[in-house]
């Protein structure tokens, strides 16, 4: 590989804020924030909204969806709205 043209691959601390779980993973992601990990070292820090620790597909905590669509729900909610005086 040519020197100086590749991004810096280093350990990065990813934080799933929904589940409050930290992942230390090798990455080239750029960030200016840092955070001290449980091992005592300071790593670049990236906050995540969703990861495998909090996503319903991976956790098994899926919610059931209703069978009626959005339009049917709208019509049901506002069915008598135009007829009221």
From Swiss-Prot:
InterPro entries: Ribosomal_bL28/bL31-like_sf, Ribosomal_bL31, Ribosomal_bL31_B, Ribosomal_bL31_sf. The keyword Transport does not apply. Keywords: Ribonucleoprotein, Ribosomal protein. GO terms for cellular component: ribonucleoprotein complex; ribosome. One of its GO terms (molecular function) is structural constituent of ribosome. One of its GO terms (biological process) is translation. Signal peptide: none annotated. The keyword Nucleotide-binding does not apply. Belongs to the bacterial ribosomal protein bL31 family. Type B subfamily. Part of the 50S ribosomal subunit. NCBIfam families: L31, PRK01678.1. This is Large ribosomal subunit protein bL31B.
């Amino acid at each position: 590989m040519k020197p100086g043209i590749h991004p810096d691959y280093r350990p990065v601390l990813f934080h799933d804020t929904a589940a409050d779980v930290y992942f230390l993973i090798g990455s080239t992601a750029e960030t200016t924030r840092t955070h001290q990990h449980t091992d005592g070292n300071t790593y670049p820090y990236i906050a995540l909204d969703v990861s495998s620790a909090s996503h319903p597909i991976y956790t098994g905590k899926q919610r059931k969806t209703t069978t009626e669509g959005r339009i049917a729900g709208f019509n049901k909610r506002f069915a008598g709205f135009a007829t009221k005086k």
